[in-house]
């Protein structure tokens, strides 16, 4: 039998080399850099709050390990901020970057380091979404949220002592982002069947497993609890790995994410990304004919929003976001197809009790 190899089927997988998750692991960041042969000038990308939470300590630890450090403070995840970081890196001769924060600083360091062609380390101070280990960066470009391909971190250092001390709302949002894997994978399977899109079994299985772990442990996810933080961080890292294996965000981003991005554009005051994705997952699971009640019940146990009122968003914006969600990424086929009718959008939101 002759084996035919399709050269176009080859995929590049970029995964973190070191992942440290646990109590006090921030203190090991110097060892991580030595292990990865990272030396020279480090540029720390962080925010005002996270500078005090972890940024200053990381700077001290790196200098004790023999590196020199500079710090750049960020305020918004915009392309202008990326340019600012790149300029600072060039001025200081940075040989590697560290993103320290709950998401924004990590995404900025991720994209800036990709363009500079130097490695970066992800140091999350909260577990609010799966960007901590993925090769995607959420950036505001020309006033609109965009998901941009970038490099994965060379290492992730997630100190659960720090993460568990962050506002519990961030951890809850991270759970919503993970649980949304269920409908993301269903959308991916649908696109494979109807549009002959590539579907990766391994990436899909890893994505589903992360969501299942969070749902099965929903009762035990509590505030200021390091075990909870560890569980959620590991699931978020698994999401990042699944996306790297797939070569796209498909395993963790489908119609529920498109709904969330539509809300970002429409609602005057959007909620957290993971919170909106969780609510979106309830409705998209209904459209898929799945067990949407299980999704809703798990989110309730964790303390996540399950309706418009809990999101702090008016009912009409939920319906409007459902109507526009399919157009957020026209190239990505989902259960939304070519869009819902106004009556269908209102029906799914009412049946799932997302609106009253």
From Swiss-Prot:
Subcellular location: Cytoplasm
List of residues binding NAD(+): 103-107, 125-128, 134
A single BP term in Gene Ontology: phospholipid biosynthetic process
Pfam families reported in the protein's UniProt record: Fe-ADH_2
Cofactor note: Binds 1 zinc ion per subunit.
Pathway field: Membrane lipid metabolism; glycerophospholipid metabolism
InterPro entries: G1P_dehydrogenase_arc (IPR023002), G1PDH (IPR032837), Glycerol_DH (IPR016205)
Source organism superkingdom: Archaea
UniProt EC number: 1.1.1.261
Residues holding Zn(2+): 177, 257, 273
Co-factor(s): Zn(2+)
MF annotations from Gene Ontology: glycerol-1-phosphate dehydrogenase (NAD+) activity; glycerol-1-phosphate dehydrogenase (NADP+) activity; metal ion binding
Annotated HAMAP family: G1P_dehydrogenase_A
Record protein name field: Glycerol-1-phosphate dehydrogenase [NAD(P)+]
Organism in which the protein naturally occurs: Methanosarcina acetivorans (strain ATCC 35395 / DSM 2834 / JCM 12185 / C2A)
Source taxonomy: Archaea, Methanobacteriati, Methanobacteriota, Stenosarchaea group, Methanomicrobia
């Amino acid at each position: 039998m002759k084996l035919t190899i399709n050269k176009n089927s080859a995929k590049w997988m970029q995964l973190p080399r070191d992942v440290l998750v646990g109590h006090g692991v921030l203190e090991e960041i110097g060892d991580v850099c030595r292990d990865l042969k990272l030396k020279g000038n480090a540029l720390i990308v962080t925010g005002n709050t996270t500078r005090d939470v972890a940024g200053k300590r990381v700077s001290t630890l790196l200098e004790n390990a023999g590196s020199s450090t500079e710090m750049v403070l960020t305020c918004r995840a915009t392309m202008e901020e990326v340019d600012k970081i790149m300029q600072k890196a060039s001025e200081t001769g940075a040989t590697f970057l560290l993103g320290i924060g709950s998401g924004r600083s990590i995404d900025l360091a991720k994209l800036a380091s990709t363009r500079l062609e130097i490695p970066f380390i992800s140091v999350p101070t909260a577990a609010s979404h799966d960007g901590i280990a993925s090769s995607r960066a959420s950036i505001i470009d020309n006033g609109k949220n965009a998901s941009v391909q970038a490099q994965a971190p060379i290492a992730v250092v997630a100190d659960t002592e720090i993460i568990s001390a962050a506002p519990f709302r961030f951890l809850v949002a991270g759970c919503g982002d993970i649980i949304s894997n269920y409908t993301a994978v269903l959308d991916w399977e649908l696109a494979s069947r109807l549009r002959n899109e590539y579907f990766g079994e391994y990436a899909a299985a890893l994505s589903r497993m992360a969501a299942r772990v969070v749902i099965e442990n929903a009762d035990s996810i509590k505030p200021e609890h390091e075990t909870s933080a560890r569980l959620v961080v590991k699931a978020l890292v698994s999401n990042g790995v699944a996306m790297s294996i797939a070569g796209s965000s498909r395993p963790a981003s489908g119609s529920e994410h498109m709904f969330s991005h539509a809300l970002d554009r429409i609602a005057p005051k959007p909620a957290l990304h993971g919170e909106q994705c969780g609510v979106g997952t309830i409705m998209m699971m209904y459209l898929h004919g799945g067990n949407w009640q299980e999704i809703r019940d798990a989110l309730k146990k964790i303390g996540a929003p399950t309706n418009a009122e809990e999101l702090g968003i008016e009912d009409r914006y939920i319906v409007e976001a459902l109507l526009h969600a399919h157009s957020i990424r026209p190239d990505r086929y989902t259960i939304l197809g070519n869009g819902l009718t106004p009556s269908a959008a209102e029906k799914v939101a009412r049946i799932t009790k997302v609106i009253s």
